[in-house]
Amino acid sequence: MVKARKEPVNAVQVFGRKKTATAVAYCKRGKGLLRVNGRPLDQIEPKVLQYKLQEPLLLLGKEKFAGVDIRIRVSGGGHVAQIYAIRQAISKALVSFYQKYVDEASRKELKDILTQYDRTLLVADPRRCEPKKFGGPGARARYQKSYR
């Protein structure tokens, strides 16, 4: 019995982050599948931010995504933070896939298009919530002071 040799899976795994939301994207050769937690992109809520999710696809064109499957797991954060994490994960996954398995010139082209439009598509936003301190209701606000 001869075992059929499986060709190695050309895949990359990257993550996108926004606040406490983390999206892990797994990108491999395929036929253009894009799924978030097992659901297609157009079923992701809220519908108002649907265009934010579509931005990498609209910027780079569907033909760039035709040869790859991207599966994304997202957790943590709120709805908006998750959407920003997903779009970052999609962009980073495609760029790193092109770097590893296609060629450096097309990777640079993709990276330039994405950063020219919006830098947060590839670079995480470092802003975090400031911790609350004593003497006030929040991080900076103080309780009202009375003299008499």
From Swiss-Prot:
GO molecular-function terms, A-Z: RNA binding; structural constituent of ribosome
Gene3D superfamilies: 3.30.230.10
One GO CC term, this protein: cytosolic small ribosomal subunit
PROSITE patterns: RIBOSOMAL_S9 (PS00360)
SUPFAM superfamilies: Ribosomal protein S5 domain 2-like (SSF54211)
GO BP term (any one): maturation of SSU-rRNA from tricistronic rRNA transcript (SSU-rRNA, 5.8S rRNA, LSU-rRNA)
Bilayer-spanning residue ranges: none
Keyword Ribonucleoprotein: yes
Keywords carried by this UniProt record: Ribonucleoprotein, Ribosomal protein
NCBIfam families: PRK00474.1
PANTHER family (UniProt xref): RIBOSOMAL PROTEIN S16, RIBOSOMAL PROTEIN S9
Family: Belongs to the universal ribosomal protein uS9 family.
Protein known as: Small ribosomal subunit protein uS9
